[in-house]
Amino acid sequence: KTIRRERRDALADGVEALCLTGSDLTEAVWDAFFDFYMDTGSRKWGRPYLNRRFFSLLGERMADRVLLVMARRGGRWIAGALNLIGADALYGRNWGAIENRPFLHFELCYYQAIEWAIGHGLARVEAGAQGEHKLARGYRPTTTYSAHWIADPSFRRAVDDYLGRERRQVARDEAALTEYLPFRHEEGSE
């Protein structure tokens, strides 16, 4: 019920969602998406690191491996989500909007992406790191890994010590968060 309501509310007031790939990824579409990307980057965790040319190159060189889920209202693009198409998965990367609309983020980044992936025979959707709100929408917590090399031996030991504790806490958090998934728990199953 909640998901149906969210989806209805996201697409109210004449908002429509479109899944674009291949030749549908025009420069005008990339212009709009870049505006969304810049707006989100300027409001959240620091500065955006991709320039406008990057998106043109993405469209030129791998348009068939890109899915943009875009929303428009009254003929004007208002939000979008960038996904990369893998062999068996759809990978959500960036989101942005120039209109703040309830649940539109969930509609474009999760629900539309899941529908598109199912319709194209992909086994899963990887929605990216962070966000406890993903649990209610059926995304299992998964550990995200990274690798770093630290030149200074003293600093490396300090970071290694911290990361040992961090790994244990992340494992506990992942186990605890799994309990909140909206799936039925049956005896003998996860």
Tell where the protein language model's regions lie, with residue ranges:
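A conserved beta-strand-loop-helix scaffold within acyl/acetyltransferase catalytic domains
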Residues: 1-102, 149, 181-190
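Hydrophobic alpha-helix feature that most strongly marks membrane-spanning transmembrane helices
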Residues: 38, 42-45, 59-63, 76, ...
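Mixed-charge, polar/low-complexity N-terminal
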Residues: 29-30, 51-53, 114, 120-121, ...
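Acyl-donor binding region in acyl/amide transferases
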Residues: 87-153, 160
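Extended aliphatic helical segments
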Residues: 15, 29, 66-69, 118, ...
